[in-house]
Curated annotation (Swiss-Prot):
Keywords: Coiled coil, Nucleus. InterPro entries: Cyclophilin-like_dom_sf, Cyclophilin-type_PPIase_CS, Cyclophilin-type_PPIase_dom, Cyclophilin_A-like. Belongs to the cyclophilin-type PPIase family. Pfam families: Pro_isomerase. This is Spliceosome-associated protein CWC27 homolog. Residues 254-272 have a biased composition (Acidic residues). Residues 281-332 form a coiled coil. GO terms for biological process: protein folding. Part of the activated spliceosome B/catalytic step 1 spliceosome, one of the forms of the spliceosome which has a well-formed active site but still cannot catalyze the branching reaction and is composed at least of 52 proteins, the U2, U5 and U6 snRNAs and the pre-mRNA. Recruited during early steps of activated spliceosome B maturation, it is probably one of the first proteins released from this complex as he matures to the spliceosome C complex. Component of the minor spliceosome, which splices U12-type introns. GO terms for molecular function: peptidyl-prolyl cis-trans isomerase activity. It comes from Danio rerio.
Amino acid sequence: MSNIYIQEPPTNGKVLLKTSAGDIDIELWSKETPKACRNFVQLCMEGYYDGTIFHRMVPEFIVQGGDPTGTGTGGESIYGRPFKDEFHSRLRFNRRGLVAMANAGPHDNGSQFFFTLGRADELNNKHTIFGKVTGDTVYNMLRLADVACDGDERPLNPHKIRSTEVLHSPFDDIIPREIKGKKEKNKDEAKKSQSKATKNFSLLSFGEEAEEDEEMVNQVSQTMKGKSKSSHDLLKDDPKLSSVPVVDRNQGEGDFEDSDDDEDDAEDDSDREAEKAKVRENIAKKLKKDKTDEEKSSQDLVKKTSRSDELRKEARQLKKELLAIKQRKEDGVKKEEDVSEVGDSKQNSEAVTEYLESRKKYDDMRKQKLKKGSGREAQTLALLESFKSKLSSAISETPSAPEEDVEELAEDDDKGWMAHVLHFDEQSRKVKDANMQDEDTFEIYDPRNPVNKRRREESKKLLKDKKARR
């Protein structure tokens, strides 16, 4: 494991993610992947990842986040468009704790990123590795995977990124956009101020008159608040207006109320009866429709069942026919095999009977044998004595005949070999000279042999003489 860290290049830059699972320290490879690191650092400065969830989790593979929509299809880069992949020969998906850009294809990087939970060689040269998780925060990163997921790899209770903090920025020229500030301004503008506006009448040339009119209007509005306004209320000093009301309010209200109540009761009764009749008609229509639908469905079921029964019967008949055809074929093959077996049995019957008889004979002999012990030893000695007597009787019974006749008897009779005498040619015991060349001698070359030494010395002398003559 140590050689893996030696192969990785040094980091430059550090970011802290504060998540619901704990803090996660990320060190960046800003020299090897400058575009991806600049994008990640600026988005963290702008608070782009604040409140986003880790929307995808594959056990022992990856945990993915960085999408503000939480769907897995959103997110934009700081460049306004997807930026290119950045691969490096010393950055490989060979362990857990690596941070890489998520994409939907080549050169399609936005704001989404993922953490690796193990070795993932199949992602090499497909996703840009721009950082790694350091220290004990790796265990907080692993806690992101301790959630239950549905069939689409979405966590049921996903973890969130609460806030981000850039501890060391490798890029001094980054100017964060005011995305977070704009949101706060919009919220403040949405809240309406409840403080009342004050009018400064001293700025007007007719300020005193306007101020008096304003006071009169305020008094009238307060007195007539919640009431209908008429000329009797506003123009109290007008002599043309009579002080006697045209209609008595109490009397008029009582008459109107009685007549209105009677009319309303009659209208309500008629409306209720009409509504009841409509409801009854609708219920009757629905019942008729339900009955017709049930009848149609029952007829369809009967038709379907009858059709299915017919198909089943046809299938059964076809199966029976196929089985009968197979049985006929098997019977014909069996008959042929029986005929061939009968012919073979006639030929092999004699050999089989002999084999069975001999096997039975040896089985009986094996049964007669005793087990290990004193009885077994006595039996073997008895067998040895019987063999000796048989051998001596065979030698005494055989007549003196020439050797050729003895060999013929040994071949014909099973006991002839007992009277056979071993004869072999006598080999000559003459001593052979090693220096004599004969067909039976072997050529032996040994440099230590005195004969070979003399030959070498003689050949050396001949060579010296030839050189001296020249």
